[in-house]
């Protein structure tokens, strides 16, 4: 049972994978709620990597991109500014140094 709890499977309580939960938590700790100013995505990814998720930055940023794309999630958890991809090519997002983000109104409900 312990192995299943630490896997990258969505939790039944909120539907988030561990990396997604860490991104939302780190953004809330940075004060990036829905009414705050946008902050560079590289800052958020660096904070997540340094404190909570010691894996590659591309995996963390791709998880954040999926949470920001309105065509990937029914209720996007991240409000993004910049090039976050297109519905016909979702992998065409810009590098994290060119995008900015904050939490959406939906993520404040978590």
Swiss-Prot record:
Active site as annotated: 98
Alphabetic keyword roster: Cell membrane, DNA-binding, Isomerase, Membrane, Topoisomerase
EC assignment: 5.6.2.2
GO molecular function list: ATP binding; DNA binding; DNA topoisomerase type II (double strand cut, ATP-hydrolyzing) activity
SMART domains: TOP4c
Enzyme class (EC, first level): isomerase
Gene3D superfamilies xrefs: Topoisomerase II, domain 5
Pfam families according to UniProt: DNA_topoisoIV (PF00521)
UniProt subcellular location: Cell membrane
Any single biological process term in GO: chromosome segregation
SUPFAM superfamilies for this protein: Type II DNA topoisomerase (SSF56719)
Subunit structure: Heterotetramer composed of ParC and ParE.
PANTHER family xref list: DNA GYRASE/TOPOISOMERASE SUBUNIT A (PTHR43493), DNA TOPOISOMERASE 4 SUBUNIT A (PTHR43493:SF1)
Primary role: Topoisomerase IV is essential for chromosome segregation. It relaxes supercoiled DNA. Performs the decatenation events required during the replication of a circular DNA molecule.
Protein name: DNA topoisomerase 4 subunit A
Taxonomic lineage from the root: Bacteria, Pseudomonadati, Pseudomonadota, Gammaproteobacteria, Enterobacterales
Gene: parC
